[in-house]
Amino acid sequence: LVVVNVQRGGPSTGQPTKMEQGDLMTAIFGSHGDAPKVVMAASTIEDCFYSVITARKIAETFNMVVVVLSDANLGTSQQPFPRPQFSETWLAPPVAKSAVPEGMKPYDLDASPGLVRRSVPGQPNGMHTLTGLAHDRASHVAYDPESNEEGIRARSLKLAALQKTLKTPPVFGDEESL
């Protein structure tokens, strides 16, 4: 899931055309429980285009929520930028369509730390019932501490796996102020 949040001044302050980054903390920390997500911020109109591509790739590859933040200035602006040439690197890795091994549960971790193998409609042995509630590897609702701990560990492993793929972002301004 990719959520794009174009922020403006608010709430109902008579400032709907003013810029504000008032949703930043809510985007980062505004959830219940241990549900990590990726939060990105676009800095230019061209960056808005590429940020959504990157966000979609992260969301699909790591099966997690990605929030892309922008502000009213970028959200209401128009600016030409060079027509991008399509790149295969924009795409998430393809979902395996071979038969799911017999007995494999929907939340069994695959070789990639913290990631689960997704099935696609029509895939042999790939039909599962999934839940958004706390669950065990078989997707049965489970409130026991062991299942909860395993879910937290799996979500943490996703972030660690993602972190290994990231490049150091550029610094704008005085690097000494960091």
Can you describe what each PLM-predicted range is?
Residues N5-S12, T44-E46, A72-G75:
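Acidic, glycine-rich active-site loops and adjacent beta-strand->loop/helix elements
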Residues E20-D23, P36, G126, T168:
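Glycine-rich, flexible loop/turn motifs
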Residues S51-L178:
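Flexible, low-complexity linker and terminal segments
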Residues L1, Q21-G22, G33-K37, T61-V65, ...:
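Short coil/turn connectors at secondary-structure junctions
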Residues A35-K57:
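Active-site/ligand-binding-proximal alpha/beta "capping" segment
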Residues L1-D34:
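Flexible glycine/proline-rich, aromatic-decorated loop/lid segments
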Residues V4, T17-E20, C48-S51, A59-F62:
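Active-site-proximal structural scaffolding
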Residues V2-V3, V39-A41, V67-L69, T76:
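Structured core elements
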